[in-house]
C-alpha cells in the first residue's frame, strides 16, 4: 500500500516522495496536501495563496494545477483519484470554499477570471453504477467538466458531469447544470439549468455598499471586453478532453495544460454557442401556445424562463 504523505506547510514539500510539487504557494493557511498515490503533480503559479484548502490524491497519475491567484485566497477542497486533471485558471476568486471531486479518469478545467460564490460543488461522475434494464449495459459514464473564462457561478450551484460552460456565462444560485452546454454571454437558472437571458455580460464590482451616485454611474458600461465571439482562436472542449485522455503520464498532461491553456491568452479561446439551447427554449414555448389551456404551472414556468 502506498504510504500516506501529508504536507501541512511549505517546509513539508521537500519530504514528498514519488510525487512532484512544482512551485510554492505564498501562503498555506489552514491548508494541507495529502498524497496516497504516486506520479501525481501539483503546480502552484506565482502569488497563489491557500486558505482552508485541501488537495487529496487518492490514486496515481493526477495533475492539480493552480494558476496565479485572484483578489482572494484560493479556498477549495479537491479530491482526485486516478488519471484526472483539475485545472484552475488565472485570477479566479472563491468567495468561500468550492468543492471538487474527480473520478474515473475524467477532468475539471476552469478558465481565467472566474468568480465563485458560496457552497458550490463540481463533480464529474455519479457515485454508483447505473445500468439499462434491457441491454444490461452501463448508462452513467463519468464525463469531464469545462468552465470557460470570466464565468460567474452563484451560491449553492451544482456543476455536474458533462457540463460545458462558455466564457462570459452566469450560472444562477442553486442551479443544477445537468451536464448541459451553457452558451457564452448567457444567464442560466433552475433545475436543470435553462437559459433565462441571452446577450449579457457581467462585471466584478459588488453593489453591497453602493450609494445613489454609484448606482447611477453603473447604469451603462460601453466597453465590450467581456463579450465573446467565435474566431480562429476558439478551442474545442471535446478536443482538449480527448487529448488529455490520450496522454499517458502526469508529466505529459502537465506540459499539455501549460502550453495549451496556461500560456494561451486568446480572449475567445473558450467561446461556446450551441444553437440547440435556444431552439429547445423556443420549441417549449411554441408547443404550449398551440395547446388548449396549458397547465398553469407550465405557463408560469415559461414566463419565468423568458423574463
List PLM regions with ranges:
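Extended, small-residue-rich solenoid/repeat segments and analogous flexible loops
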Residues: 1-60
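Intrinsic-disorder/low-complexity regions
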Residues: 7, 17-18, 38, 61, ...
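Intrinsic disorder/low-structure terminal segments
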Residues: 12, 34, 42-43, 57, ...
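Intrinsic-disorder/low-complexity coil detector
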Residues: 24, 126, 293-294
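Flexible, glycine/small-residue-enriched loop-and-beta-strand segment within the central core
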Residues: 34-35, 39-164, 175, 180
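Glycine-rich hexapeptide-repeat left-handed beta-helix
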Residues: 118-267
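C-terminal non-catalytic accessory extensions
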Residues: 250-307
